[in-house]
């Protein structure tokens, strides 16, 4: 008997569905609306990229308005501007990049989840003030944002996007442009654990954080299991211990525990489950960008076929926490790939990815908005272009994957 991958995944979903917001904890808006009913419990969300960890390529105009033009990362910009000037500049950004109106718009598009990337420096007690340069004051804006999202009925994932010492080299998403990844040592792990404990206290004691159901303990570690050995043997088990220790001290009921998310084994940093002795409410994350996968033939048919058949996760339950409609730099402005003259292809590719990712626990698009003047990295612009439907169940009405089995 031939057992399909979809059949196996559906069986697993039946066995492990208890962790979902609709099952162990009803999440509703202030007027009682459950946004998960329309998605049958699947996560459908967007990342709030560049709100608290600025990636200059996403919004070069806003980066320049901060006074950061020519700087690689927040660390570099704060060092250039000076602490007081940087604090004032970033406060204006935090107050304007994602607003209450953005949250209303996200909800109106049929989405039910936001993922908020943050850096460890949001807990300002963890900053080495004599050698680290990050903007101060972000937490008040995070709390306000989570309050808006909770009122709207959105599920919230807080993601440790920027880890102490930087989890990868030369990438602004860590908050700095470090020459080498410095995260994978005990004292940096300890700083990250202190951040997770601090964040857990905030989530369970402040009303605005009531819809935060998941903490991701580090975003996109190095894709090399040899480099990340202690991440798996030390940091992941201790992250569970630290979060549960706080929840125990606060007498939190087990059904209200935070889900603890790690990068899935398919990410390439090894099996996150390898050394766990406690995996209660564990969750996993993978990021899928065909743009950077040299194994995939760069053709429209190949992209849709790959997305239809992609094995995107090895652990369960998994969320595809970042993905986009981005294509390789050397073809993205050619006739076959330009965004506004190839709407039909991008509609189908979006549908293929959603259909695949909802065989798991769902997806979170990267990102909500950009200043790129096109939609391949901007969910908001994708809706306005007609590539992304506001009725997300519509992507299942036309089977774009029919006849495209691997």
UniProtKB/Swiss-Prot annotation:
Pfam family membership, one: Cellulase
Glycosylation sites: 31
EC number(s) on file: 3.2.1.75
Keywords: Carbohydrate metabolism, Cell wall biogenesis/degradation, Glycoprotein, Glycosidase, Hydrolase, Polysaccharide degradation, Secreted, Signal
Top-level taxonomy: Eukaryota, Fungi, Dikarya, Ascomycota, Pezizomycotina
Subcellular location as annotated: Secreted
Species whose genome carries this gene: Aspergillus oryzae (strain ATCC 42149 / RIB 40)
Active-site annotation: 220 (proton donor), 322 (nucleophile)
Family label: Belongs to the glycosyl hydrolase 5 (cellulase A) family.
GO molecular function, one term: glucan endo-1,6-beta-glucosidase activity
Purpose of the protein: Beta-glucanases participate in the metabolism of beta-glucan, the main structural component of the cell wall. Acts on lutean, pustulan and 1,6-oligo-beta-D-glucosides.
InterPro entries linked: Glyco_hydro_5, Glycoside_hydrolase_SF, Glycosyl_hydrolase_5
Protein name: Probable glucan endo-1,6-beta-glucosidase B
Catalyzed reactions: Random hydrolysis of (1->6)-linkages in (1->6)-beta-D-glucans
Signal sequence extent: 1-18
A GO term from the CC aspect: cell surface
Gene3D superfamilies found in the cross-reference section: Glycosidases
GO biological process, one term: cell wall organization
Superkingdom: Eukaryota
């Amino acid at each position: 008997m031939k057992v399909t991958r979809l059949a196996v995944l559906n069986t697993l979903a039946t066995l492990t569905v208890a962790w979902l917001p609709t099952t162990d904890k009803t999440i509703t808006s202030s007027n009682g609306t459950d946004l998960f009913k329309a998605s049958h419990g699947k996560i459908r969300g967007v990342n709030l990229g560049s709100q608290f960890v600025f990636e200059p390529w996403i919004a070069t105009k806003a980066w320049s308005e901060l006074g950061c033009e020519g700087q690689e990362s927040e660390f570099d910009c704060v060092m250039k501007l000076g602490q007081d000037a940087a604090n004032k500049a970033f406060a204006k950004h935090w107050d304007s990049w994602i607003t209450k109106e953005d949250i209303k718009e996200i909800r109106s598009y049929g989405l039910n989840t936001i993922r908020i990337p943050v850096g460890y420096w949001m807990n300002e007690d963890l900053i080495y003030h004599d050698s680290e340069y990050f903007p101060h004051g972000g937490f008040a804006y995070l709390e306000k944002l989570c309050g808006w999202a909770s009122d709207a009925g959105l599920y919230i994932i807080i993601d440790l996007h920027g880890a102490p010492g930087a989890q990868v080299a030369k990438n602004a998403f860590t908050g700095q442009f470090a020459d080498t990844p410095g995260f994978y040592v005990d004292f940096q792990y300890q700083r990250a654990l202190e951040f997770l404990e601090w964040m857990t206290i905030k989530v369970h004691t402040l009303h605005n954080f009531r819809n935060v159901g998941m903490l991701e303990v580090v975003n996109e570690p190095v894709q090399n299991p040899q480099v990340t050995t202690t991440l798996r043997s030390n940091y992941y088990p201790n992250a569970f211990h630290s979060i549960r220790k706080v929840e125990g001290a606060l007498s939190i009921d087990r059904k209200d525990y935070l889900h603890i998310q790690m990068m899935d084994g398919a990410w390439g940093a090894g099996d996150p489950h390898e050394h766990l002795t406690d995996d209660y409410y564990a969750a996993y994350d993978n990021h899928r960008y065909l743009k950077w996968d040299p194994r995939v033939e760069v053709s429209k048919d190949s992209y849709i076929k790959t997305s239809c058949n992609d094995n995107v996760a090895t652990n369960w339950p998994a969320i595809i926490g970042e993905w986009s409609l981005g294509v390789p730099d050397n073809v993205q402005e050619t006739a076959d790939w330009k965004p506004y003259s190839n709407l039909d292809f991008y509609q189908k590719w979006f549908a293929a990815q959603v259909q695949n990712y909802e065989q798991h626990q769902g997806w979170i698009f990267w990102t909500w908005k950009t200043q790129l003047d096109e939609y391949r990295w901007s969910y908001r612009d994708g809706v306005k272009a007609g590539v992304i439907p506001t009725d997300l169940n519509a992507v299942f009405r036309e089977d774009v994957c029919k006849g495209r089995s691997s």
